[in-house]
Amino acid sequence: MKERTFVALKPDAVKRKLIGKIIERFENKGFEIVAMKMIKLDREMAEKYYEEHKGKEFYERLINFMTSGRMIVMVVEGENAISVVRKMIGKTNPAEAEPGTIRGDFALTTPDNIIHASDSKESAEREIKLFFKEDEIFDK
Ligand SMILES: Nc1ncnc2c1ncn2[C@@H]1O[C@H](COP(=O)(O)OP(=O)(O)OP(=O)(O)O)[C@@H](O)[C@H]1O
């Protein structure tokens, strides 16, 4: 089933100049990038985005990291995009992510684990809406 997922290249990916290498993997796999832009999260947006982690031991570090620099956000489209992209990015903790996955190949620690991708249809819809207006997403 053709579907859309939301992907963010986190501040460490931009700082380390990995944007091209990561996008290349999605294009090589056969996905279409139907929306993309550069953003910088402010504290309010980061807190809204990571609401579920409020109160956790790593929350402050996570918010500081996510607001530390610019990011790339995109909408990736293709067959089973949500589950396939999650597989391609690898486990949340890069030390446990398999080699061959994006986190397995490019990261070693959290919260600076390079990339985020939606983990369900509901979160994909929510996250795409949070970052893109309808007319910023292109079908053709
Ligand atoms: N134990 C931890 N210590 C530090 N940072 C963490 C830890 N666990 C998660 N994080 C950070 O919070 C983010 C969100 O965690 P979550 O458990 O939702 O994982 P995820 O769904 O793989 O991540 P993301 O939402 O970024 O794709 C992680 O990607 C990572 O940057």
From Swiss-Prot:
Residue stretches in coiled coil: none
InterPro entries: NDK-like_dom, NDK-like_dom_sf, Nucleoside_diP_kinase, Nucleoside_diP_kinase_AS
Stated family: Belongs to the NDK family.
GO molecular function terms noted in the UniProt entry: ATP binding; metal ion binding; nucleoside diphosphate kinase activity
Pfam families xrefs: NDK (PF00334)
SUPFAM superfamilies associated with the record: Nucleoside diphosphate kinase, NDK
GO CC field: cytoplasm
Gene3D superfamilies (UniProt xref): Nucleoside diphosphate kinase-like domain
Compartment(s): Cytoplasm
Gene designation per UniProt: ndk
SMART domains for this protein: NDK (SM00562)
Catalysis performed (reactions): a 2'-deoxyribonucleoside 5'-diphosphate + ATP = a 2'-deoxyribonucleoside 5'-triphosphate + ADP; a ribonucleoside 5'-diphosphate + ATP = a ribonucleoside 5'-triphosphate + ADP
Key words, A-Z: ATP-binding, Cytoplasm, Kinase, Magnesium, Metal-binding, Nucleotide metabolism, Nucleotide-binding, Phosphoprotein, Transferase
Subunit and interaction comment: Homohexamer.
Active site per UniProt: H116
UniProt superkingdom: Archaea
GO BP annotation list: CTP biosynthetic process; GTP biosynthetic process; UTP biosynthetic process
Name of protein: Nucleoside diphosphate kinase
Major localisation: cytoplasm
Amino-acid positions noted as binding ATP in the UniProt annotation, renumbered to this chain: K10, F58, R86, T92, R103, N113
